[in-house]
Amino acid sequence: LCALSMGNRTYLLISIIIALAWVFSLLSVHSAEKTIQVSSGLSGQKVNRGDVVSMEITVSHKGFLPIAPVALHMRATSNTPAGTIHLTQLGKRRQRVVHKFAADHVGAMFPGMESYTVSDVFGFFKHDRQPDTSGQELLVLPVPFEVEPLTFAAGDMGVETMKRAMEDPSSPADIRAYQQGDPLKRIHWKMSARKREIMVRQFEEPALPDALVLLDTSPPLLSPGLPEDRRPFLCDALLETAASVVACQIRQDNPVRMPLVGDRPMEYSSRMGLPVLLEELARCTFNETEQFERVVMMQLAELRKTGAVVIITTRMTSPLCDLIVRMKRMGPNVRLYLVTFVADDPETAPLVAKLQQAAVEVNYVTPSGS
């Protein structure tokens, strides 16, 4: 309008250039937005805590006009902060970027893009779009560490007792045909001579007492004065302590069970294998609203065949202390893992002393983020 009113050719030329640029920008964004494809892939869907994960993001479009580098708005997870990645290859129809991050915390998450921005090269138009899919699930598994093997209560049958019972020649449960690897002392010579084939004695296998692992899946208790970003480290320590105890029992060929409550309740048994437990622990959300004391109380009625109990928590209250002492008096050995950043807390010290007086084994676990 200014160019037309003043009759200046220079202004008219500038106006035409701006108008063409505006039309060019609109067409470039519109054509790219209609044909754009955004995909992402992870280097692995299951990784251990502490591993480095690579995410490859590919952006392509079939628009006939160039556009500005696409801006990728990354989704915030416990391992990836929210942020924006600007692709640097200006004008190319296919752009690729590799985003690396460390899996610092255990959990199940969907790292990737929350949205992306398509804009023209002049910056006139910007359109935000969301990807068609939420991306691949990343499962960060807990990493077990070395713990002391559990000791079972006196009078319980251990591995050596079971072996002796299995080798008692005076109490066979059945007789079967010989199999490769059977010891000679199990051969029933009289029965073998009668049947004219080698027969061996079969013995009943006495059941070993199992170990019970109780994990507190309520929101972890953070010591006063500590920043909120320390809470994920408490969750990691809880999960890895539970995985470590179970892994130790499996290596010792001792049965262990672990009831899990929360969004995915289940009764884990060592017969399921350690990988199943690691995946279930990785999906634990620590949003259980039921008090842990009630969970412990529900297990008191099932301690008849339990030789050892492990309790893993971040809080120590007077009711929980009384329940642990009561559990110890019922027979099994009890071990407590108290996960905390402050081991010398004056509020919990009297309760810990009470547990130790009742012959409860108390262990402190300091999270890795201390």
Each model region followed by its residue ranges:
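Von Willebrand factor type A / integrin I
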Residues: 1-31, 56, 283, 287-370
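An amphipathic, basic-hydrophobic helix/alpha-beta surface used to engage anionic
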Residues: 20-268, 308-312, 326
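Short, structured secondary-structure boundary patches
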Residues: 162-165, 182, 269-272, 277-283, ...
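Flexible internal linker/loop segments at domain or repeat junctions
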Residues: 225-226, 260-300
